[in-house]
Amino acid sequence: MGWLKYFLRELLEYVSLMRTTWLAVWGVFFLAGTSHAWDGQYQVIQQDPIEKFPKWTGILGSVQAELNKQADIQAPFAGGWAEFIEKTKSDDRLAMIKKTNETFNSMRYVPDQKNWGVPDLWNTPIQFTQSPDYIVPGRMSGDCEDHAIAKYYALQRLGFTQDELRVLVVKDLNLGVGHCILGVIFGGQCLILDNQIKSVWPANQIQHYKPIYAINETHWWQFIPAGTAAPAAAAGGQAD
């Protein structure tokens, strides 16, 4: 997938910007002074700045204003974005997570090339839930990062903090392709919301994904194989 190649290239170009201040664990993220290996397989190291990921920061720059402006506009899905939030906001937190996953998983997976005529386009939740007429009017669709982004912001609107949320880029070892999912820190573990998996599962019970990096609104984290030295500082280039 084009978006995975894009981010991998950025990851290599900006590896010099690493600094180890947080430990994010594939299964749970928590504060720590140094990085450790996850289950003997990965070190997870905080990286900054997120501005090196312009597609992600582009979403951040527009989505909150869009959601606030259109909070009362009824999108086609589930009676509308605002109605979904209203119906879900009184649920317990685990029910919120499950309902968010179920609701957005009901929307079709359609690659960006087919949906928008471009190889890679990251959509805001409102864009994702209001499909272009040239696909199927009234049917919502998007690719994996669109599902993950919509779930991220739905849970934020329901009261989850960004520290509890991670957009995760992984490699699907079964299919040999890149994939994007959402991780939610809940009950001392990381729950995975995935458009390819119907139910919500703890990350440590999903064996066919190789984590590459995680990102939220303030930081990103790289997964490095255990036993591999953290790359030394080096000159970095400019992101596209």
Features from the language model and the residues they span:
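A structural boundary/capping signal
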Residues: G33-D240
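Short non-domain terminal segments
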Residues: K5, V15, G27-V28, H36, ...
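Bacterial N-terminal signal peptides that target proteins for export
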Residues: W3-W22
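Bacterial N-terminal signal peptides
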Residues: T21-A32
